[in-house]
C-alpha cells in the first residue's frame, strides 16, 4: 500500500533521541525544547515561539491567552479541520462560519467582513492544505475593526506570502507537528507571537499557571500543555531539513500536475504571490464528475493506493449543524465533495507518483 503520508526520519532524529535518553532529560525540560523554540522562531523570523503538546492545544492556548471566552464570537472558515472550531467552543466562545473563495479553498475575506459584529473578538485564518489564505487582507481587516487575528498554520509550515512566512501576520499563530505534518515531532505543536504579553500568558497557562520564581505558587486555573524534550529532539532534527522536505513535496505536486493534465480535475493551484508548501497534494474533480469522487478513491484503494477525502465543512457536523443551514455555504459544500488528497510524503519516488497518476487515468478510461 502506498500511504497518504509517511514521515521522513532519516536525519538526526535517532541521534538526538538517544542524547535525550542518555542525559535523562526525557520530560518537559531540556536543551532540545530550548533549541526547538529558538530555531523555530528564527526560521519564521518571529520574536517568540513556545512548544506545546499538540496542535489542538496550541489553538486553545492561543485563544485562552487572548482572553477569548463566553459571549465572544470568533469567525472561522467552515472548510477546515474540526479542531479549529472545537477549540473556539472549548474557550466558551461561539464559532461564526465563513465561506471559502472557491478553488483556492481559502476563506473569503468578503464573507469574513460580512460576519463581523459587536460580539466578534477574533478572526481565525486557516491556511488549508499548505496554501496561504489572503492573510494580508485579513490582517488589514482585523486592524480596521480592532480584532485579534489568529493564524492556524497546522498545515502550512514554510508557506509564504510575498516572501513572508505565514505565522508572522497574526497576533498569535499556531503550528502542528503530528506524524502526518510536513515536519513532525511525533505529537507536538508551537505557539508563536511577536507580543511579549501574549507569549508570557501562554507560558504561564501551559505550565499550570505557576508564578516565575516562586515554586508551587499558582495564580491561574491553567493547563499542562508542555512538550517533552523527546518530542522536541525529533522536532529539531526535522527543522534542520524542512526546506529539503518542502522542496520534495513541491516537486511531487508538480509531477501530479503534469501527469494529470487533461483529466477532468485540477491539482490545487498556487495563488499569485504565494509559496505553497503542499502539505498534501490535493485534486479537485470538475463539478460534473463529483459523483465519481468516492468511486475513484475506492479504485485507488483496490490498487493499494491510499487517499483521503477533503474535510467535511464544520457546519455540516452534528454538533455544529444548528449554527447554519447545511446549504448555507455552497462553495465549501461543493469543494468538500469533489476533493481528494493524494500520497504526498517527501520520500515518494517519481515512479510511485506516476503509478498513482496512471491508476487515476485508468479509472477515468473505464467510466
Swiss-Prot record:
Its cofactor is pyridoxal 5'-phosphate. Optimum pH is 8.0. Pfam families: DegT_DnrJ_EryC1. Its EC number is 2.6.1.102. One of its GO terms (molecular function) is GDP-4-dehydro-6-deoxy-D-mannose-4-aminotransferase activity. It catalyses: GDP-alpha-D-perosamine + 2-oxoglutarate = GDP-4-dehydro-alpha-D-rhamnose + L-glutamate. The modification N6-(pyridoxal phosphate)lysine is found at residue 181. Keywords: Aminotransferase, Lipopolysaccharide biosynthesis, Pyridoxal phosphate, Transferase. GO terms for biological process: O antigen biosynthetic process. CDD domains: AHBA_syn. Pathway: Bacterial outer membrane biogenesis; LPS O-antigen biosynthesis. Homotetramer. Catalyzes the synthesis of GDP-perosamine from GDP-4-keto-6-deoxy-D-mannose and L-glutamate. Also shows weak activity with L-glutamine. Belongs to the DegT/DnrJ/EryC1 family. This is GDP-perosamine synthase. The gene is rfbE.
Amino acid at each position: 500500500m502506498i500511504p497518504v503520508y509517511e514521515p521522513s526520519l532519516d536525519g538526526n532524529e535517532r541521534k538526538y533521541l538517544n542524547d535525550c535518553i542518555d542525559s535523562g532529560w526525557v520530560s518537559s525540560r531540556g536543551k532540545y525544547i530550548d533549541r526547538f523554540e529558538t530555531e523555530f522562531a528564527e526560521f519564521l523570523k518571529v520574536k517568540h515561539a513556545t512548544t506545546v503538546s499538540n496542535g489542538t492545544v496550541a489553538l486553545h492556548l492561543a485563544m485562552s491567552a487572548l482572553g477569548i471566552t463566553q459571549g465572544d464570537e470568533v469567525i472561522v472558515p467552515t472548510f477546515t479541520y474540526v479542531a479549529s472550531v472545537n477549540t473556539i467552543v472549548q474557550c466558551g466562545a461561539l464559532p461564526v462560519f465563513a465561506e471559502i473563495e472557491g478553488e483556492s479553498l481559502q476563506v473569503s475575506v468578503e464573507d469574513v467582513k460580512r460576519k463581523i459584529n459587536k460580539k466578534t473578538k477574533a478572526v481565525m485564518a486557516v491556511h488549508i492544505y499548505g496554501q496561504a489564505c489572503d492573510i494580508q487582507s485579513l490582517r488589514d481587516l482585523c486592524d480596521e475593526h480592532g480584532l485579534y487575528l489568529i493564524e492556524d498554520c497546522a498545515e502550512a509550515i514554510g508557506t509564504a506570502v510575498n516572501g513572508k512566512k505565514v505565522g508572522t501576520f497574526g497576533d498569535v499563530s499556531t503550528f502542528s507537528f503530528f506524524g502526518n505534518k510536513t515536519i513532525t515531532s511525533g505529537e507536538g505543536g508551537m505557539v508563536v507571537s511577536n507580543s511579549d504579553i501574549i507569549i508570557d500568558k501562554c507560558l504561564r497557562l501551559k505550565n499550570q499557571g505557576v508564578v516565575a520564581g516562586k515554586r508551587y505558587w499558582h495564580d491561574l486555573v491553567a493547563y499542562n500543555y508542555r512538550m517533552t524534550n523527546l518530542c522536541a529532539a525529533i522536532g529539531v532534527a526535522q527543522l534542520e531539513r524542512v526546506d529539503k522536505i518542502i522542496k520534495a513535496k513541491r516537486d511531487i505536486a508538480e509531477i501530479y500536475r503534469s501527469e494529470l493534465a487533461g483529466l477532468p480535475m485540477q491539482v490545487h493551484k498556487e495563488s499569485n504571490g504565494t509559496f505553497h508548501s503542499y502539505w498534501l497534494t490535493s485534486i479537485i474533480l470538475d463539478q460534473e464528475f463529483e459523483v465519481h469522487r468516492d468511486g475513484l478513491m475506492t479504485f485507488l484503494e483496490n490498487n493499494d493506493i491510499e487517499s483521503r477525502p477533503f474535510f467535511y465543512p464544520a457546519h455540516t457536523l452534528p454538533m455544529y449543524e444548528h449554527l447554519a443551514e447545511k446549504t448555507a455555504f455552497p462553495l465549501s459544500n461543493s469543494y468538500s465533495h469533489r476533493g481528494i488528497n493524494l500520497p504526498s510524503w517527501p520520500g515518494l519516488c517519481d515512479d510511485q507518483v506516476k503509478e498513482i497518476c496512471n491508476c487515476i487515468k485508468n479509472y477515468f478510461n473505464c467510466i
